[in-house]
Amino acid sequence: MQHEIVIVLDFGGQYNQLIARRVRECGVYCEIWPYDTPLEKIIEKNPKGIIFTGGPSSVYEENAPVVDKKIFEIGVPILGICYGNQLIAYFLGGKVSTALFREYGKTHIKYNTNSPLFTGLPESSICWMSHTDFVEELPEGFEILASTENCAIAAFGSREKKIYGVQFHPEVVHTEFGQEIIKNFLFNICGCKGDWKTSSFIEERINEIRKIVGNQKVVCALSGGVDSSVAAVLVHKAIGKNLFCIFVDHGLLRKGEAEEVIKTFKGQFDMNVIKVDAKERFLKALCGVIDPERKRKIIGEEFIRVFEEEASKLGDVKFLVQGTIYPDVVESGVGKAATIKSHHNVGGLPEHIKFERIIEPLRELFKDEVRRVGVELGIPEKIVKRQPFPGPGLAIRIIGEVTEEKLEILREVDWIFRKEIEACGLDEEIWQYFAVLTDMRSVGVMGDERTYDYTVALRAVTSVDGMTADWARIPYDVLERVSNEIVNTVRKVNRVVYDITSKPPATIEWE
């Protein structure tokens, strides 16, 4: 089935993935493409609408990202956001200027609710601004649709041309009625029907996998996390016993995790699960390595080598399944965006892979979408709602060199923290919570004796999709109990700190 599609052209803004997520929440499928995608390719896809994202550039910069001007003549509705809004005005004959001061944060805005873009909205509300340049004069044939105290043209458009621009960011939660604005664009202006659903995604992926794989054997990288679990069950549903799940126990897992994975997938789902004990191999490869990017690359490479070796025992295996999801791709660098950190499912892969093809059935989904797919597939709630755990495991939660002793310390600390959070019923409120073993030692006093031991950091955040996150406000008495148990029961730890940094500026993981 061919779904209606909206194309999001990426100009390098920080909220671009949120735009895609908001569109999908409306039941409309969308894809993010680089801003310099050839117009012919866009036309070939027959999109219902096009969205220009924000970005850090100015339209007057020498190498500013631009589009083919003919895009405004193909009859497809366009919505420009922030930089995209300025680009539309600039290309169509308007004037863009630079403000004396940057406008950033929540701003009162007044809408022309007669416009199809703002139908159903109150005449005034709050929006989120983040810009220096602004549209000073409109292109011919366009009208002002919204304004703020400092931005006379906060939105403009042409009902006839179906081209609209907004200087603010409707995709962020700080903009009141932002989702309604996006819905209005999709349904009132683009004429979308909203035919993209989780159930149809599953059916299409199953058919696609069967078509690609046929009767051949497939190896799946199974870790027991949400992503790899959903990927494994989805592929198993498509090809059954031709799927061989390889579970690599690299010694970097949390307490009791390896045993739980085998019990669930081999026992409950009756899958072919091959367990590989590779603890010594990974520790040897990580010996002396301190740089987090090197850790990720080494772990990714060792993973693939183990898969190759195990797959060779199965005969001719051409396909490898991985649980890569959209934020993995985003943070590893998409289009012109900068790389934040390498993910073992993306940038951590070695250049030479002996498998003919990597199958990533969840590559286009955000985490919340992956969870919904998992529920549809009948995966137990305890797995579907499991908090994210990075592929490199505890290796990137140990700052500095990874050793067996440090792993044992971190496992115990992490287990104590997770146990207490679950006992208090906070596990469903918090997106992710874990411990980090820092490379910092500090002086302490225990039993009238001086100690000089490790400092551990506790990290807990609230989020929806992992793209942005805020630190969780865990009650002090809970943190106190966790801290007391850690320093009293875990050897070589004498200090516990709590990380209160949001994302951005920090990432959720420390490495």
Swiss-Prot record:
Protein's pathway: Purine metabolism; GMP biosynthesis; GMP from XMP (L-Gln route): step 1/1
GMPS ATP-PPase domain sequence ranges: 196-386
Gene Ontology molecular function: ATP binding; GMP synthase activity
Name recorded for this polypeptide: GMP synthase [glutamine-hydrolyzing]
Source organism of this protein record: Caldicellulosiruptor saccharolyticus (strain ATCC 43494 / DSM 8903 / Tp8T 6331)
Listed NCBIfam families: guaA_Cterm (TIGR00884), guaA_Nterm (TIGR00888), PRK00074.1 (NF000848)
Keyword Manganese appears in the UniProt entry: no
Pfam families: GATase, GMP_synt_C, NAD_synthase
Taxonomic path: Bacteria, Bacillati, Bacillota, Bacillota incertae sedis, Caldicellulosiruptorales
Function: Catalyzes the synthesis of GMP from XMP.
Domain of life: Bacteria
